[in-house]
Each structure stands twice: as structure tokens, then as C-alpha cells.
């Protein structure tokens, strides 16, 4: 196994570290400062109408309800004017967000593919080690049969030598898998 941790497709989401709600609200307030002003005027008119209603002043109540309607109209105009004025900037922001999303998806996909490749390579390494150990175990079992029959032993030894040489090349010329297993089990150098 490698020392470094494998990348995972379940890593932390970087969207969390970008604009949070307060930053977005601050940006919107800077972009369209008249909208919150209209909302505040509407709320103030409703509050004054409520107080006038509690006091029983119907003239002031009607005046405040009219003020509320004017404040709401002002708010709607501010929203419409702001949307027309900032339309190109919002389109650019949407395109930038789409590009960033595509980049994030591509990075996540690349990390996922790299993770799969690493795991596949580890599986192949494990299978090759397992096959090598299995071949070494079979080689130990076959050897007593070779020693029993003298005429066949010479033919088998000649046919096994190329196989041993090819096995030596795979293992880096260390004397073969069989000798490595013998060294491990009998403690010789």
C-alpha cells in the first residue's frame, strides 16, 4: 500500500468555502441599495398604520396605507431598474459559475478516475503476488515427483530451466521465486 491517502470522490465540497449567505447579502445590498430602502419604507408605513389603528385615527391609517402602496411601488421600480442595469453582470456571473462548476466536476471526475486507477493497480499487484506465491507453492509440490523418475527428470529439468530463467527476469534476477520461498522458510541467505 502507498503511504499517501487515496483521493476520494467524497472529499469536502469547496462550495462551502466560497460565498456564504452574508457575503451574498452584502453584495446584493451594494448592487441594489434602493430595494432595501423601499422595503424599510413599506415596513415603517405598515407599523405607523398599525399604531394609528390602535389609537383610532382613521385618517392617519388611510394615509399610511397609501404610503405603503407608494413604498411598494418604489420597491418594484427599484427591482426592475436594478435587473435591467445589472443584467449583463449577472449573465457574466452565471457564465463564470457554470465554468467553475464544470471545472469542479472535471476535477472530481479526474480524482475519481485516479482513485480507480490506483485501486486497479493495487489489485493487479496483489493478483501478481498471489499468482507468484501460488506458482512457488506448486513448484515445491512438483519437485518430489521430478526426483522419483530419473529418465524423465532430465527432460523435465531441461524444460523447466527456460521457465526458471524467465521467472528470474520477472523477479529481477534474484534466483527465482522458489529459492526466495526456500530462503524464507529455511532461513538461508
Curated annotation (Swiss-Prot):
Membrane topology qualifier: Multi-pass membrane protein
GO cellular component: mitochondrial membrane
Keywords in alphabetical order: Coiled coil, Membrane, Mitochondrion, Transmembrane, Transmembrane helix
GO biological process terms held by the UniProt record: mitochondrial respirasome assembly
Top-level taxon in the UniProt lineage: Eukaryota
Composition bias type Basic and acidic residues, residue spans: 154-172
Coiled-coil intervals: 86-122
Pfam families: HIG_1_N
Region feature Disordered, mapped onto this chain: 142-189
Sequence ranges assigned to domain HIG1 in this UniProt record: 6-97
Main subcellular location of this protein, as a coarse class: mitochondrion
Regions that span the bilayer: 33-49, 64-86
InterPro entries membership: Hypoxia_induced_domain, RCF1
Compartments (UniProt record): Mitochondrion membrane
Assembly with partners or alone: Associates with the respiratory chain complex III/complex IV supercomplex.
Family the entry assigns: Belongs to the RCF1 family.
Function field: Cytochrome c oxidase subunit which plays a role in assembly of respiratory supercomplexes.
Name listed for the protein in its UniProt record: Respiratory supercomplex factor 1, mitochondrial
Organism whose genome encodes this protein: Trichophyton verrucosum (strain HKI 0517)
Top-level taxonomy: Eukaryota, Fungi, Dikarya, Ascomycota, Pezizomycotina
Gene: RCF1
Amino acid at each position: 500500500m502507498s503511504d499517501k491517502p487515496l483521493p476520494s470522490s467524497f472529499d469536502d465540497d469547496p462550495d462551502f468555502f466560497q460565498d456564504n449567505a452574508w457575503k451574498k447579502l452584502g453584495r446584493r445590498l451594494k448592487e441594489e441599495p434602493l430595494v432595501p430602502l423601499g422595503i424599510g419604507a413599506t415596513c415603517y408605513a405598515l407599523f405607523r398604520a398599525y399604531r394609528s389603528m390602535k389609537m383610532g385615527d382613521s385618517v392617519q391609517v388611510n394615509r399610511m396605507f397609501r404610503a405603503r402602496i407608494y413604498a411598494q411601488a418604489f420597491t418594484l421600480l427599484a427591482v426592475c431598474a436594478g435587473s435591467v442595469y445589472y443584467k449583463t453582470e449577472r449573465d457574466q456571473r452565471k457564465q463564470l459559475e457554470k465554468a467553475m462548476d464544470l471545472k469542479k466536476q472535471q476535477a472530481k471526475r479526474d480524482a475519481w478516475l485516479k482513485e480507480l486507477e490506483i485501486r486497479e493497480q493495487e489489485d493487479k499487484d496483489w493478483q501478481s503476488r498471489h499468482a507468484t506465491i501460488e506458482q512457488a507453492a506448486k513448484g515445491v509440490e512438483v519437485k518430489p515427483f521430478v526426483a522419483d523418475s530419473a529418465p524423465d527428470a532430465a527432460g523435465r529439468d531441461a524444460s523447466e530451466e527456460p521457465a526458471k530463467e524467465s521467472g528470474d527476469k520477472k523477479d529481477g534476477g534474484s534466483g527465482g521465486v522458489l529459492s526466495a520461498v526456500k530462503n524464507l522458510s529455511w532461513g538461508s541467505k
